[in-house]
Amino acid sequence: MPATAISAPKNIVLVHGGFVDGSGWQAVYQFLCKDGFAVSIVQNPINSLADDVRVTKRVIAAQSGPVILVGHSYGGVVITEAGNDPKVVGLVYIAAFAPDQGESVSSLIKDPPPGAPVPPILPPQDGYLLLDKAKFPASFAADVDLGAAEFMADSQVP
């Protein structure tokens, strides 16, 4: 079948990163819906990678047809794992981690290359991590409206 006869996937599944929920995708959601895409936003519990992959695969299963997975930050790890689903035809990483076999987010940020920004992760409290609110907009949501980035910083999910 010629490539021109294949229709582009219309299902896009957005996967948020750590520290936030799916509401950070609102502007992207509106833009894609306006262009005629069927967009779903995963609300991962951020308890474990296995749980997040399971929730993402549940959203993939609910789609009628091929799916493009889009992940931001830690969401890249999730889409890497969930991307082996037969419905998934593409992965899009937006400022996201794309670990190789055996790598984790921790191993990727442990020894950053010289000059690379270091995530402003605060010391754990009760076993949970948060980003420094003052540094959140520049480090996590640099291309987001400042008001939206500040809201995301104040509504972080540990």
Task: Please place each PLM-identified region on the residue numbering.
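Glycine-rich His-Gly loop
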Residues: 15-18, 72-73, 96
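Gly/Ala-rich beta-loop-alpha elbow adjacent to hydrolase catalytic centers
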Residues: 70-75, 79
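Conserved alpha/beta-hydrolase catalytic His-Asp/Glu region
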Residues: 128-158
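Active-site catalytic motif of lipid deacylating hydrolases and related acyltransferases
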Residues: 5-65
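Flexible "cap/lid" loop of the alpha/beta hydrolase fold
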Residues: 84-133
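Active-site signature of alpha/beta-hydrolase-fold catalytic machinery across serine-
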Residues: 27, 81-82
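Glycine-rich FAD cofactor-binding loop and adjacent beta-loop-alpha segment at the N-terminus
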Residues: 56, 70, 91
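Short glycine/proline-enriched coil/turn segments at helix->beta-strand junctions
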Residues: 35-37, 62-66, 84-89, 157
